[in-house]
Design a protein with these regions (language model features):
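Conserved N-terminal segment of class I S-adenosyl-L-methionine
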Residues: 1-90, 94-96, 108-111, 126-128, ...
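Short catalytic micro-motifs in class I SAM-dependent methyltransferases
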Residues: 98-100
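Short N-terminal helix/helix-N-cap motif within the alpha/beta-hydrolase-1
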Residues: 105-109, 136
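A short glycine-rich, Lys/Arg-flanked "PGG" loop and its adjoining helix->strand segment in the class I
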Residues: 109-123
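Conserved class I S-adenosyl-L-methionine
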Residues: 126-148
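Short glycine/proline- and charge-enriched loop/turn segments
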Residues: 142-152, 193-199
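Acceptor-substrate binding/catalytic loop of class I
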Residues: 148-165
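Substrate-binding/catalytic lobe of Class I Rossmann-like enzymes that use SAM or dcSAM, i.e.
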Residues: 167-176
Length: 220
């Protein structure tokens, strides 16, 4: 099951301005050649194509891959960590890893392996949950650490990151962090004003309040 897949289908694009999807799309930009790793049904590829990007996807779920082929220039089917990637060095402007690295068996090794695919001015753009979020810290204080079907402690997450360990992992894999943003969702409240206020509070201490990190990194 990919990061964007649920038992009932595939997670739709969240276009809220302070949400992870909108921030990812903003970091990718327009008119880029993008490798979308773990592309799911193409929910991120679709708006990128509408912005003039050429998107190549990798997806191991057959049903999702078929949906992604409707919008991607090409979709490779398989486990990205295991497959031979048939691309020349410096083939892409952007390597897109939306909610991917926490699912990988060896994130650092994989990120290092794909780094040569970036053009010199290219970017790795990714999101991943913040395991040091205040709710998890509070749970530890009261002796509670429960895995769930979704969220930061999703049962399918193999690696969890704090802000510091994420930066360290990227640097060891051959990247330099250019921008590190975050999301602070407000469950059950969808107004732009409330979300903007939550984001402003998160700015006071992102390592505590961030639910998810949104990163742009350049080849070092």
């Amino acid at each position: 099951m990919t990061a964007a897949q649920t038992a009932g289908g595939y997670v739709p694009l969240n276009e809220r301005p302070h949400g992870g999807h909108a921030k990812l799309l903003g970091l990718v930009g327009a008119g880029k050649r993008v490798l979308d790793i773990g592309c799911s049904s193409g929910y991120l590829a679709r708006p990128l194509v509408q912005r003039g990007c050429t998107v190549v996807g990798i997806e191991q779920d057959l049903v999702a891959a078929e949906q992604a082929r409707e919008v991607c220039a090409e979709v490779l089917v398989g486990d990205a960590e295991e497959m031979e990637l048939p691309f020349e060095p410096a083939s892409f402007d952007v390597l897109l890893c939306g909610d991917l690295v926490e699912h990988l068996r060896d994130p650092e090794r994989f990120l290092a392996r794909i780094q040569p695919l970036l053009r010199p001015d290219g970017r790795l753009v990714l999101t991943t949950p913040n395991v040091a979020n205040w709710a998890n810290r509070l749970g530890l204080l009261v002796g509670r650490w429960r895995y769930t079907d979704r969220g930061i402690l999703d049962r399918t997450h193999l690696h969890l990151f704090t802000r510091a360990t994420l930066v360290e992992t990227l640097e060891r894999a051959g990247y330099s962090v250019v921008e590190l943003d975050y999301t602070v969702p407000v469950p059950g409240v969808g107004t732009a004003g409330v979300e903007a206020a939550a984001h402003a509070v998160g700015r006071l201490r992102p390592s505590l309040f961030a639910y998810q990190f949104v990163v742009s990194a350049a080849p070092a």
